[in-house]
C-alpha cells in the first residue's frame, strides 16, 4: 500500500516532468489558440483552454451576482457553475491521462456549447460575450480531443 509521501512524491515528479516536457517542446511558446491556424491541437492546449474556461465561468458567475436582473436567473447561474466544474474536471482528467477522457471531453463540449448559447442570450454585455467566446473555444478543443489518444 502506498503511503502518503510516496503518492505526493509521485505527483510532484509527474508535475515536474510535465513542466519539463512542455518547456522543451519546440515551437510551442506563443503558439496562440489551437484550431485558429496557430498549430496542432494538443492535450496541453486543451488543458489550458479548459482551465481558462473554468476561471471565466466562475468570474462571470460572480459578475452576474453583482449585476442582477437577467444575469441572476437561477438556470443561467447554475449553467455557469456546471460549466466551470465540468471544465475543471476535464482539465484534471487530461492531466492524469484518464482513459475516459473521450467521454469527459464530449460532455464538456456539450456543456460549454450550452453555456455559450446562454451567455449570448444576454446581449449588449462584454463580459457575457467574452464568456461565450471562451466557452465556444473550449467546446471546439474538447470535441477535438474526444478521439485523440493521450
Task: Give the location of each predicted region.
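N-terminal secretory signal peptides and thylakoid transit peptides that target proteins
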Residues: 1-15
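Long terminal segments
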Residues: 2, 24, 120-150
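Short charge-dense sequence patches
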Residues: 4, 32-40, 56-66, 83-90
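C-terminal segment of N-terminal export signals and the immediately downstream linker at the start
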Residues: 21-58
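Intrinsic low-complexity, intrinsically disordered segments enriched in polar/basic residues
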Residues: 28-36, 83, 106-108, 145-148
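Extended, low-complexity, charged alpha-helical tracts
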Residues: 49, 61-65, 70-75, 79-112, ...
Amino acid at each position: 500500500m502506498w503511503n502518503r509521501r510516496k503518492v505526493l512524491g509521485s505527483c510532484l515528479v509527474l508535475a515536474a516532468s510535465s513542466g519539463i516536457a512542455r518547456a522543451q517542446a519546440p515551437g510551442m511558446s506563443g503558439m496562440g489558440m489551437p484550431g485558429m491556424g496557430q498549430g496542432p491541437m494538443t492535450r496541453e492546449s486543451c488543458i489550458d483552454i479548459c482551465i481558462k474556461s473554468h476561471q471565466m465561468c466562475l468570474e462571470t458567475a460572480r459578475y452576474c451576482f453583482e449585476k442582477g436582473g437577467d444575469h441572476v436567473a437561477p438556470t443561467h447561474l447554475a449553467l455557469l457553475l456546471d460549466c466551470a466544474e465540468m471544465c475543471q474536471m476535464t482539465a484534471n482528467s487530461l492531466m492524469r491521462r484518464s482513459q475516459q477522457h473521450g467521454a469527459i471531453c464530449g460532455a464538456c463540449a456539450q456543456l460549454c456549447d450550452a453555456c455559450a448559447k446562454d451567455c449570448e442570450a444576454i446581449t449588449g454585455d462584454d463580459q457575457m460575450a467574452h464568456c461565450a467566446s471562451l466557452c465556444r473555444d473550449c467546446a471546439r478543443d474538447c470535441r477535438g480531443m474526444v478521439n485523440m489518444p493521450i
